[in-house]
Amino acid sequence: MTTAQPQTGTPAWRLLLSYVRPHRTALFAGALLSLVTGATGLLLPLVARELIDDLAQDRAITGALLAMSGLVVANTALGALGSYVLRRTAESVVLGARRTLSSYLLRLRIAAVDRTEPGDLMARITSDTTLLREVTTDSLIGLGTGGLTLVATLVMMGVVDPVLLGVTLAVVLGAGTVLGLIVPRINRASRQAQDAVGVMGAALERILGALRTVKASGAEPREERVLHEAAEESWRQSVRAAKWSAAAGNTAGLAMQIAFITVLAVGGARVATGAIDVGTLVAFLLFVFYLMSPIQQVVGAITQYQTGRAALGRIQDALGLPAEPQARPVPLPSAGAPPASVSFREVRFRYADDLPYIHHGVSFEVPARGMTAFVGPSGAGKTTVFSLVERFYDPDSGEITLDGRSLGDWELSSLRASIGYVEQDAPVLSGSLRDNLLLGNPEGDEATLAAVLKTTRLDGLVERLPNGLETLVGHRGTKLSGGERQRVAIARALLRRPRLLLLDEATSQLDAVNEAALRDTVADVARTTTVLVVAHRLSTVTMADRIVVMDAGRVRAVGTHRELVTADPLYAELAATQFLATGG
């Protein structure tokens, strides 16, 4: 299915049209059916006038009754068909918007994600896109068909009696002035209501993401109050929006009641003077009744558009967040691909303009092949090195190269295809163990998978699990231990056959036996691959070919363990504790 491309800085209605455009044929068909439905409805008052005239003159009314019955049946059938076509099209518009937005959110730069609440972004995909359904049917089509039906009805009323039409228009224009004052308030209230839904989603995501900590801290009552306050704020804003929408709808209804009473009074006087006959008055009153439907449709379209405009604004805001360029998928490195070299030259970096610098002119060289360890106190900037290599962020100044080529010159997909990355917290996604292992290499064969499972000592775990590799690991891998999650993350990285392997505290939760085994695995991998390790255990650091000592965002020394113990006081102090600082 075709989906709209992200557009920013454009009016909300134009963004809506970009979602509607792929479905314009179906939309036109539904609108045409709605117009035909309206046209058949306009004939009913005229048939009713003929029926009354026939009764007044004692003529047979069979033909008029049959015609009226046929029109009613046809009107109902066409209306039902048109409604189905429009609703189906509206669902397709929602699908297109969700596909566009979800694809865009997956390409968001990490810096943009850092500044937003995940729960609010989820609300934009689930809640805000749902409102496009009503905007498409009630607003876009409702305004078109309702407006045309309104004009056609007024024309027919003018044909029946121009004087009564003037009376009706005076009342309708008065109501329109009142509506013009109400509509902007609906837009503001709707935006605030949807923002409140996003805040509530963010609050819920925050709590569920750390539910064990909340329970262990006995913080349920306080967090419950936070959730309730967010829900109540959403309720207050939604009630405010509903108040103005109800005011708009009832203003239209009141206007039509006033119009009916006024037409009845003026029309009665005209019948009394002989200006018109009773059949004409009845026909005009039927048109007044019929006028209520398109007027309410137009008013509903305007009020619904204000709600949809707020939703489109939130969707547009999300599509305006900084994102990575779209890139074609690229194959992973082949077995035996040459290892990568990495260099940092005077790199300065901070996570946001209002935050202090993490790196203050970091420089180092990592040759192809071998293992390089990064050590230093917490907050020294070690993990940030890996984030910059992956281009989750770009440095403020300086240059980072891979194989002598600036990272900015690499296509992102090609760059990341060369890298295997094991994060500090070793995230595991909901799904099966197999899905998680093959996340970075869906085409991995069974033989390679079995070999990596053995290398990372996961083969025993797979044998113990009830469904083996197909066992579901739970939300964020809650059915696995911390050490098992780390081994899954390492196996996942190895299955990508990386030219550069980044291990950030990759063995921090492993027992001594598993750590020793994986240490041997990493040493073996380092013979053919470039391995960068952030580690806090001395046993891991001492096996590195070179060690980069970082402190306060600077590289203070580079060398082997033996060299640094005597040459660098900070490293000597860290080594003496037998436990290097975690984090940073």
Curated annotation (Swiss-Prot):
The ABC transporter domain, residue ranges: 342-577
SUPFAM superfamilies membership: ABC transporter transmembrane region, P-loop containing nucleoside triphosphate hydrolases
Keyword NADP appears in the UniProt entry: no
Binding residues for ATP: G376, P377, S378, G379, A380, G381, K382, T383
GO MF terms held by the record: ABC-type transporter activity; ATP binding; ATP hydrolysis activity; ATPase-coupled lipid transmembrane transporter activity
The protein, known as: Uncharacterized ABC transporter ATP-binding protein SCO0742
Localization of this protein: Cell membrane
GO cellular component: plasma membrane
Signal peptide region: none
Main localization, broad class: membrane
Family (UniProt): Belongs to the ABC transporter superfamily.
Chain ranges passing through the membrane: 27-47, 61-81, 140-160, 163-183, 246-266, 271-291
Keywords assigned by UniProt, alphabetized: ATP-binding, Cell membrane, Membrane, Nucleotide-binding, Transmembrane, Transmembrane helix, Transport
GO biological process, one term: transmembrane transport
Pfam families from the UniProt entry: ABC_membrane, ABC_tran
Record membrane topology: Multi-pass membrane protein
Sequence ranges assigned to domain ABC transmembrane type-1 in this UniProt record: 27-307
InterPro entries according to UniProt: AAA+_ATPase, ABC1_TM_dom, ABC1_TM_sf, ABC_transporter-like_ATP-bd, ABC_transporter-like_CS, P-loop_NTPase, Type_1_exporter
